[in-house]
Amino acid sequence: MIGRLRGIILEKQPPVVLIEASGVGYEVQMPMTCFYELPDIQHEAIIFTHFVVREDAQLLFGFNSKPERALFRELIKVNGVGPKLALAILSGMSAQQFVTAVEREEIAALVKLPGVGKKTAERLVVEMKDRFKGMHGDLFASDAPFALTSEMPKETANDAEGEAVAALTALGYKPQEASRMIVKVGKPDADCETLIREALRAAI
Protein backbone atom coordinates (compact mmCIF):
# COMPACT_ATOMS: atom_id res chain seq x y z
CA MET A 1 0.00 0.00 0.00
CA ILE A 2 1.27 3.47 -0.91
CA GLY A 3 0.94 5.67 2.17
CA ARG A 4 3.25 8.60 1.46
CA LEU A 5 4.88 10.22 -1.56
CA ARG A 6 7.78 12.64 -1.60
CA GLY A 7 8.74 14.03 -4.98
CA ILE A 8 8.59 16.78 -7.57
CA ILE A 9 5.29 18.14 -8.83
CA LEU A 10 5.17 17.77 -12.62
CA GLU A 11 1.59 18.80 -13.40
CA LYS A 12 -1.37 20.32 -11.58
CA GLN A 13 -4.81 19.83 -13.13
CA PRO A 14 -7.43 20.30 -10.37
CA PRO A 15 -8.23 18.08 -8.60
CA VAL A 16 -5.35 15.88 -9.87
CA VAL A 17 -1.64 16.39 -9.28
CA LEU A 18 1.13 14.43 -11.02
CA ILE A 19 4.09 13.90 -8.70
CA GLU A 20 7.34 12.14 -9.63
CA ALA A 21 8.92 10.01 -6.92
CA SER A 22 11.98 7.85 -7.65
CA GLY A 23 11.45 8.19 -11.39
CA VAL A 24 7.79 7.15 -11.30
CA GLY A 25 4.95 9.60 -11.95
CA TYR A 26 1.92 9.17 -9.70
CA GLU A 27 -1.47 10.70 -10.45
CA VAL A 28 -3.04 11.72 -7.16
CA GLN A 29 -6.55 13.05 -6.63
CA MET A 30 -6.73 15.63 -3.86
CA PRO A 31 -9.49 17.60 -2.14
CA MET A 32 -9.34 21.19 -3.34
CA THR A 33 -8.72 22.36 0.23
CA CYS A 34 -5.44 20.41 0.07
CA PHE A 35 -4.73 21.20 -3.58
CA TYR A 36 -4.65 24.95 -2.85
CA GLU A 37 -1.72 24.44 -0.48
CA LEU A 38 0.55 22.60 -2.90
CA PRO A 39 3.80 24.28 -3.97
CA ASP A 40 4.43 25.33 -7.56
CA ILE A 41 5.24 22.93 -10.38
CA GLN A 42 8.86 21.67 -10.28
CA HIS A 43 8.95 22.05 -6.50
CA GLU A 44 9.09 19.21 -3.98
CA ALA A 45 6.01 18.13 -2.08
CA ILE A 46 5.11 15.51 0.51
CA ILE A 47 1.68 13.94 0.15
CA PHE A 48 0.04 11.42 2.49
CA THR A 49 -1.95 8.99 0.39
CA HIS A 50 -4.80 6.50 0.52
CA PHE A 51 -4.62 3.73 -2.09
CA VAL A 52 -7.83 2.32 -3.57
CA VAL A 53 -7.82 -0.83 -5.73
CA ARG A 54 -10.80 -1.57 -7.98
CA GLU A 55 -11.40 -4.09 -10.72
CA ASP A 56 -10.97 -1.43 -13.38
CA ALA A 57 -8.58 1.02 -11.71
CA GLN A 58 -6.01 1.73 -9.02
CA LEU A 59 -6.53 5.16 -7.49
CA LEU A 60 -4.46 7.37 -5.21
CA PHE A 61 -6.05 10.04 -3.03
CA GLY A 62 -3.70 12.55 -1.45
CA PHE A 63 -3.67 14.87 1.55
CA ASN A 64 -1.29 17.39 3.08
CA SER A 65 -1.55 15.94 6.57
CA LYS A 66 -2.29 12.66 8.33
CA PRO A 67 -5.37 14.10 10.12
CA GLU A 68 -6.93 15.02 6.77
CA ARG A 69 -6.27 11.52 5.49
CA ALA A 70 -7.69 10.05 8.70
CA LEU A 71 -10.90 12.04 8.22
CA PHE A 72 -11.15 10.82 4.60
CA ARG A 73 -10.76 7.22 5.78
CA GLU A 74 -13.51 7.68 8.34
CA LEU A 75 -15.77 9.26 5.73
CA ILE A 76 -15.54 6.32 3.32
CA LYS A 77 -16.64 3.99 6.11
CA VAL A 78 -20.01 5.74 6.19
CA ASN A 79 -22.72 3.81 4.34
CA GLY A 80 -23.21 5.30 0.88
CA VAL A 81 -20.03 7.39 0.90
CA GLY A 82 -17.32 6.31 -1.52
CA PRO A 83 -13.92 7.89 -2.23
CA LYS A 84 -15.32 10.25 -4.89
CA LEU A 85 -18.02 11.64 -2.61
CA ALA A 86 -15.57 11.91 0.29
CA LEU A 87 -13.24 13.88 -2.00
CA ALA A 88 -16.10 16.21 -2.96
CA ILE A 89 -17.06 16.74 0.69
CA LEU A 90 -13.52 17.68 1.69
CA SER A 91 -13.25 19.95 -1.36
CA GLY A 92 -16.35 21.88 -0.39
CA MET A 93 -15.37 22.18 3.27
CA SER A 94 -12.10 22.16 5.15
CA ALA A 95 -11.64 19.37 7.69
CA GLN A 96 -12.44 21.80 10.52
CA GLN A 97 -15.54 23.13 8.79
CA PHE A 98 -16.83 19.60 8.23
CA VAL A 99 -16.18 18.57 11.84
CA THR A 100 -17.97 21.69 13.05
CA ALA A 101 -20.95 21.09 10.73
CA VAL A 102 -21.30 17.52 11.98
CA GLU A 103 -20.95 18.41 15.65
CA ARG A 104 -23.53 21.19 15.31
CA GLU A 105 -25.77 18.98 13.16
CA GLU A 106 -25.86 21.58 10.38
CA ILE A 107 -27.80 19.52 7.84
CA ALA A 108 -28.51 22.61 5.71
CA ALA A 109 -24.78 23.22 5.20
CA LEU A 110 -24.02 19.58 4.40
CA VAL A 111 -26.72 19.23 1.72
CA LYS A 112 -25.07 22.05 -0.26
CA LEU A 113 -22.14 19.72 -0.96
CA PRO A 114 -22.25 17.91 -4.34
CA GLY A 115 -23.80 14.45 -4.08
CA VAL A 116 -25.04 14.97 -0.53
CA GLY A 117 -28.80 14.77 -0.10
CA LYS A 118 -30.75 15.10 3.13
CA LYS A 119 -30.56 11.39 3.98
CA THR A 120 -26.81 11.27 3.36
CA ALA A 121 -26.32 14.43 5.42
CA GLU A 122 -28.29 12.96 8.31
CA ARG A 123 -26.29 9.73 8.05
CA LEU A 124 -23.04 11.70 8.11
CA VAL A 125 -24.10 13.49 11.28
CA VAL A 126 -25.15 10.30 13.07
CA GLU A 127 -22.21 8.12 12.06
CA MET A 128 -19.40 10.70 12.01
CA LYS A 129 -20.36 12.17 15.37
CA ASP A 130 -19.67 8.81 16.97
CA ARG A 131 -16.42 8.43 15.04
CA PHE A 132 -15.15 11.83 16.18
CA LYS A 133 -15.38 10.68 19.79
CA GLY A 134 -12.55 8.26 19.09
CA MET A 135 -10.38 10.86 17.37
CA HIS A 136 -8.28 13.58 18.97
CA GLY A 137 -10.18 16.85 19.06
CA ASP A 138 -7.10 18.94 18.33
CA LEU A 139 -6.43 17.22 14.99
CA PHE A 140 -8.52 19.81 13.19
CA ALA A 141 -7.85 22.81 15.39
CA SER A 142 -7.04 25.18 12.56
CA ASP A 143 -10.01 27.19 11.35
CA ALA A 144 -8.04 29.42 9.01
CA PRO A 145 -9.71 30.52 5.76
CA PHE A 146 -8.64 28.96 2.48
CA ALA A 147 -5.45 30.50 1.14
CA LEU A 148 -3.07 29.85 -1.71
CA THR A 149 0.50 29.47 -0.51
CA SER A 150 2.10 30.41 -3.80
CA GLU A 151 1.36 32.36 -6.93
CA MET A 152 0.24 30.28 -9.88
CA PRO A 153 0.96 31.10 -13.53
CA LYS A 154 -1.89 33.07 -15.04
CA GLU A 155 -3.96 31.21 -17.61
CA THR A 156 -6.10 32.99 -20.15
CA ALA A 157 -9.63 33.67 -18.93
CA ASN A 158 -11.21 31.01 -21.14
CA ASP A 159 -8.63 28.38 -20.16
CA ALA A 160 -8.97 29.14 -16.46
CA GLU A 161 -12.76 29.06 -16.54
CA GLY A 162 -12.81 25.86 -18.59
CA GLU A 163 -10.40 24.12 -16.22
CA ALA A 164 -12.38 25.32 -13.21
CA VAL A 165 -15.64 23.96 -14.66
CA ALA A 166 -13.92 20.64 -15.44
CA ALA A 167 -12.58 20.43 -11.89
CA LEU A 168 -15.99 21.10 -10.35
CA THR A 169 -17.54 18.50 -12.66
CA ALA A 170 -14.92 15.98 -11.52
CA LEU A 171 -15.94 16.74 -7.95
CA GLY A 172 -19.55 15.79 -8.66
CA TYR A 173 -21.26 18.96 -9.84
CA LYS A 174 -23.30 18.81 -13.05
CA PRO A 175 -21.63 20.68 -15.97
CA GLN A 176 -24.35 23.35 -16.21
CA GLU A 177 -24.29 23.89 -12.46
CA ALA A 178 -20.48 24.11 -12.48
CA SER A 179 -20.61 26.71 -15.26
CA ARG A 180 -23.15 28.80 -13.33
CA MET A 181 -20.97 28.63 -10.22
CA ILE A 182 -17.93 29.93 -12.10
CA VAL A 183 -19.89 32.71 -13.82
CA LYS A 184 -21.33 33.72 -10.45
CA VAL A 185 -17.81 34.25 -9.06
CA GLY A 186 -17.57 37.27 -11.35
CA LYS A 187 -13.78 37.29 -11.69
CA PRO A 188 -13.04 36.73 -15.40
CA ASP A 189 -9.31 37.43 -14.98
CA ALA A 190 -8.81 35.08 -12.02
CA ASP A 191 -6.72 31.92 -12.28
CA CYS A 192 -8.22 28.44 -12.16
CA GLU A 193 -7.57 27.74 -8.47
CA THR A 194 -9.03 31.08 -7.39
CA LEU A 195 -12.18 30.44 -9.43
CA ILE A 196 -12.62 26.99 -7.88
CA ARG A 197 -11.97 28.26 -4.37
CA GLU A 198 -14.43 31.14 -4.68
CA ALA A 199 -17.08 28.94 -6.32
CA LEU A 200 -16.88 26.36 -3.54
CA ARG A 201 -16.95 29.07 -0.89
CA ALA A 202 -20.10 30.57 -2.39
CA ALA A 203 -21.78 27.15 -2.56
CA ILE A 204 -21.57 26.56 1.19
From Swiss-Prot:
InterPro entries: DNA_helicase_Holl-junc_RuvA_I, Hlx-hairpin-Hlx_DNA-bd_motif, NA-bd_OB-fold, RuvA, RuvA_2-like, RuvA_C, RuvA_C_sf. The keyword DNA-binding applies. Residues 65-143 are annotated as: Domain II. Keywords: Cytoplasm, DNA damage, DNA recombination, DNA repair, DNA-binding. Residues 156-204 are annotated as: Domain III. One of its GO terms (molecular function) is four-way junction helicase activity. Homotetramer. Forms an RuvA(8)-RuvB(12)-Holliday junction (HJ) complex. HJ DNA is sandwiched between 2 RuvA tetramers; dsDNA enters through RuvA and exits via RuvB. An RuvB hexamer assembles on each DNA strand where it exits the tetramer. Each RuvB hexamer is contacted by two RuvA subunits (via domain III) on 2 adjacent RuvB subunits; this complex drives branch migration. In the full resolvosome a probable DNA-RuvA(4)-RuvB(12)-RuvC(2) complex forms which resolves the HJ. This is Holliday junction branch migration complex subunit RuvA. The gene is ruvA.
